[in-house]
């Protein structure tokens, strides 16, 4: 790629800066870490790898990067694309072969969404492989919009105030998942992917099928953002600014023991005596 335009340079710097801030804020990567970068062949994971490779060069700490792609044996999957790309970059990589495609097709009725089961099978396989290669962190390409969408999905359909944290210890306790693009918008990532002309691999497992619930939420957020620019960012900031005493979860705040503090200083004026 040739010299970047002013806007392209700003975009690149913004993504690198935001990823660096997220990594610092959540202590995602530490000195000596071996980071397994999970590549799907989509715009998000390509951008994540690109940004992490830059940060690896300029960071004040030393860490390894190992790229990993999971070949799920989908029909027509272009097996050559990622190896060729990673070889050209000179990045250490592994292709994990696991026929989850057949499992999903066997277990999920025709016409039903495959996303949930496919994701669980893929995640379990990658957790196991991360342990095998001694990876201390597992980097996923989820961005700010993914995190906000997941928050609303859980609220609307599961009745839970639960999102997708920038850093997470897996249920097995043996893997730490990080999301370096947590502060980055999908719009910026799409623009960067187009600019870099990454060799995108589409997911053909579900054909044209969409995860309908997620699409409903995505469309809602797009419409909100169109009418009120900055709303998605504001919602994301809210996830970082939680006040348990102002909600209703008894596990997070002790409402039952709440009583008057006899020694408290009055904060409000006695308007009757003014």
From Swiss-Prot:
Query: Which GO terms label this protein's molecular function in UniProt?
Result: 4 iron, 4 sulfur cluster binding; ATP binding; magnesium ion binding; sulfurtransferase activity; tRNA binding
Q: What is its EC number?
A: 2.8.1.-
Provide the catalytic activity annotation: cytidine(32) in tRNA + S-sulfanyl-L-cysteinyl-[cysteine desulfurase] + AH2 + ATP = 2-thiocytidine(32) in tRNA + L-cysteinyl-[cysteine desulfurase] + A + AMP + diphosphate + H(+)
What cofactor requirement does the entry state? Mg(2+); [4Fe-4S] cluster
Q: Which GO terms describe its biological process?
A: tRNA thio-modification
The residue numbers the entry assigns to motif PP-loop motif are 40-45
Q: In which pathway does it act?
A: tRNA modification
Binding residues for [4Fe-4S] cluster: 115, 118, 206
Tell whether Transit peptide is among the UniProt keywords: no
Q: Which UniProt keywords apply?
A: 4Fe-4S, ATP-binding, Cytoplasm, Iron, Iron-sulfur, Magnesium, Metal-binding, Nucleotide-binding, RNA-binding, Transferase, tRNA processing, tRNA-binding
Q: How is the cofactor bound?
A: Binds 1 [4Fe-4S] cluster per subunit. The cluster is chelated by three Cys residues, the fourth Fe has a free coordination site that may bind a sulfur atom transferred from the persulfide of IscS.
| SUPFAM superfamilies with a match to the protein in the record | Adenine nucleotide alpha hydrolases-like
Top EC class per UniProt?
transferase
Q: How does it assemble?
A: Homodimer.
UniProt-listed PANTHER family: AMINOTRAN_5 DOMAIN-CONTAINING PROTEIN, SULFURTRANSFERASE-RELATED
- Similarity remark: Belongs to the TtcA family.
Something else known = The thiolation reaction likely consists of two steps: a first activation step by ATP to form an adenylated intermediate of the target base of tRNA, and a second nucleophilic substitution step of the sulfur (S) atom supplied by the hydrosulfide attached to the Fe-S cluster.
The protein's name: tRNA-cytidine(32) 2-sulfurtransferase
Which gene name belongs to this protein?
Answer: ttcA
